[in-house]
Amino acid sequence: MFHEAVTHRPAYHTDPFFLQSDAMRKLVAATAQQADLALIEGAMGFYDGIGQTSEASAYTVSQWLETPAVLVVNPQKMGRSVAAICKGFLQLEPHNRIAGFLLNRVRSGMATYYQEIIERETGLPVYGYLPELLEVQLPSRHLGLYTAEEVDTLQEKIDLLGETARKTIVLERLQALAETAPPLPLPELPSMPPHSFRLGVAKDAAFCFYYAENLELLQRNGAELVFFSPLTDSALPEQLDGLYLGGGYPELYLPQLSGNHAFLESLRTAAQKQLPIFAECGGFLYLQQSIQDAQGKIFPMAGLLSGTATMGNRLCRFGYVTMTAQQDTLCAEKGAVIRAHSFHYADSTENGTAFSVQRPNGRTWLEVQQQGSILAGFPHWYFPSCPEAAQRFAEQCRRYQKRRNNGCRF
């Protein structure tokens, strides 16, 4: 969300757990066609992958895309030791693509000092630094940073960072470095098909976590995306053929969500008509009978699924998962395999049994509810890892549309 706020472009996931190398190269080539620079952020440390390996790490991404990597280094409270850190990264995997460094949270008077040490010891350039700017620091909470929409004066913070970077980072050298990456072959993508069904997508402060690739893949299967807000709307949009309730922070808006009786009634009416509904994480919580907050107060919710949810103070089933359908469901036939990610502090008395879920370390359990026309659970699905899931969801929506247009009773 912050990437999109800064660039005014969709942000995509170059994640080796979700994508094979060819698919990742096609994704980057296709989405960067209209850009001068494709900037890829490593979410954790450069070599931090699955388990104790570098598998599916930022290092893997740089290898697959053949792109140079610039390490961001925080050298506070260090002297020459910063060179040991930099050299350690260079030596851990000898065939890495590390091409230089950026210094973070460094006083202007110390930047040259660190730059000289690093360049002398590693032989690689330091492209500049960013000082510590208290004015742009962002607050955090249990699921990470606040969302871009919640940050006051966000544009002013972005502007200040940009103005500072122009003064302290040699941006022209970074641009020249990026141009050393070999071109990626452009995939032949068909044009977007005409809309064949209307898909409602919850999008507000409570429901804001979606993979852009999921929405685009649904569009490529004919979806017209119709955005709405469970927080502020009094009813679902008209003439919908399906619903997608994504993740977010519903636990921060429990009084508003629970108190929007008109919208909840509209949602229940749609569910009674067997409208296809796919819900992830926060959307799954919203469909429960109730949610109990961290203080023990219970808020009634949509009541479309069996089970009640409780907010906790520790992560539940966090990380990458591979899911295998144990039955035919809204988005997957029995036996279908899709990759996903879980990141939540809530738990439910009824997590479901529609999918067998496996962590990379081999741990398995059952999860995800399939009730009537509703498929819902905690994992965030990545549709490109199983395009048939998006196709099946789209087909179910078109079947509903056909029944609706024929005036069938539900």
Language-model segment annotations:
Residues 1-65, 69, 73-97, 109-112:
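ATP-dependent carboxylate-amine ligase catalytic core
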